[in-house]
């Protein structure tokens, strides 16, 4: 399942993203974050983290540096407060 999700992200990055332009307010971009989250945390938790990240990426968000939490970390300790404290 990880392989399929990463392949879909790669397709998005190559085929769809260039048409939309750079819109992500975070570093790394949401697609890179999703790929990394799935690689480190597996398909289920990685997808959950990626969806949370995409929900935070909107025009009213300040953005900033938002890295994938390390494996076995408590993701509730992270979130928007962490993203706000690491603005680019």
Swiss-Prot record:
Pfam families listed in its UniProt record: YidD
This protein's UniProt keywords: Cell inner membrane, Cell membrane, Membrane
Compartments, as annotated in UniProt: Cell inner membrane
GO cellular component, one term: plasma membrane
Membrane topology: Peripheral membrane protein
The keyword Cell inner membrane belongs to this UniProt entry's keyword annotation: yes
Origin: domain of life: Bacteria
PANTHER family named among the record's database cross-references: MEMBRANE PROTEIN INSERTION EFFICIENCY FACTOR-RELATED
Entry-linked NCBIfam families: membrane protein insertion efficiency factor YidD
Chain's role: Could be involved in insertion of integral membrane proteins into the membrane.
Family: Belongs to the UPF0161 family.
Stated name of the protein: Putative membrane protein insertion efficiency factor
Lineage of origin: Bacteria, Pseudomonadati, Pseudomonadota, Betaproteobacteria, Burkholderiales
